[in-house]
């Protein structure tokens, strides 16, 4: 189980990313449309003004049940070992154990 502080920090980053998403998108669109280099630098400075944690690259997927940051499956939102336990227990409909 991940520390509670790390889980809360990730949730805070998600909120910040949603809050500043439109500002970042509009600034990037302006940069692509303006041909003048000096104006691009001004807009680039405005793009750097939001908090660092509001950048989408700072987000990290975490397991829904344990908060583990590694080996996550996007389709389920679970880490690998929790996914395996749930499939073996029959808790995930449609998921089957592999055998070859």
Swiss-Prot record:
Q: Does the keyword Magnesium apply?
A: no
What coarse category fits the chief subcellular location reported for this protein? plastid
State the source organism's domain of life.
Eukaryota
Q: Where in the cell is it found?
A: Plastid, Chloroplast
Which InterPro entries would you find in this protein's record? Ribosomal_uS14, Ribosomal_uS14_bac/plastid, Ribosomal_uS14_CS
**What Gene3D superfamilies does the annotation carry?**
1.10.287.1480
Gene Ontology biological-process entries: translation
One Gene Ontology term of the molecular function aspect: rRNA binding
- Database matches in PROSITE patterns: RIBOSOMAL_S14
An example Gene Ontology CC term for this record: small ribosomal subunit
Q: Keyword annotations for this protein?
A: Chloroplast, Plastid, Ribonucleoprotein, Ribosomal protein, RNA-binding, rRNA-binding
Q: Which SUPFAM superfamilies match?
A: Glucocorticoid receptor-like (DNA-binding domain)
- Which Pfam families does the annotation name? Ribosomal_S14 (PF00253)
Name the family: Belongs to the universal ribosomal protein uS14 family.
Task: Quote the subunit structure annotation.
Answer: Part of the 30S ribosomal subunit.
What does the UniProt function comment say about this protein?
Answer: Binds 16S rRNA, required for the assembly of 30S particles.
- From the Swiss-Prot or TrEMBL record, give the protein name: Small ribosomal subunit protein uS14c
Organism (species): Lobularia maritima (Sweet alyssum)
Gene of origin?
A: rps14
């Amino acid at each position: 189980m991940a520390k509670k502080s790390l889980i809360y920090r990730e949730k805070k980053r998600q909120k910040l990313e949603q809050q500043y998403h439109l500002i970042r998108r509009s600034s990037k669109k302006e940069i692509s449309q303006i041909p003048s280099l000096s104006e691009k630098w001004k807009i680039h400075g405005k793009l750097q003004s939001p908090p660092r944690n509001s950048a989408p690259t700072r987000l990290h997927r975490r397991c829904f049940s344990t908060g583990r940051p590694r080996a996550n499956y996007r389709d389920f939102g679970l880490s690998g070992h929790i996914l395996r336990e749930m499939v073996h227990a029959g808790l995930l409909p449609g998921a089957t154990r592999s055998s070859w």
